[in-house]
Amino acid sequence: MSNSSLVNYTRISPNKSSRNGTKIDMVIIHCVVGQASVESLGSRFAQSSVGASSNYGIGADGRIGMYVEEKDRAWCSGGVDRYGNPIRVNGISGADIDRRAVSIECACDAYAPYKINDKVYKSLIKLLADICKRNGIIRLKW
């Protein structure tokens, strides 16, 4: 399993775990509220107390950062409800989704409608194509 050659910045997060042999067949795209940089995302994910991470992030300038290698599971979609039960989407826990997915955080505006600028969109499209090609993902659903 390889990582994207499109990466401009790397800061590996301690917030990760094994994919347990699960094949990558999804990509998760999240928006970081505020025009974040790849460095600020790296600083945030470097804090073990945050308990969150992403495989990649795209800063407001369009640069791409890597925080968790694709061979590892980023802690992006997991979580528990107020009773400590795993949050589920269509019956699948966030941890199970994270094991199947490569996650990407994208810089956006701080206020609704949380617009993503053209530099971020262009980098996102290139990164998605690269991830899909390397992992044999034929079709993405939005």
PLM regions: where:
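Active-site-adjacent loop/helix surface patches within enzyme catalytic domains
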Residues: 2-139
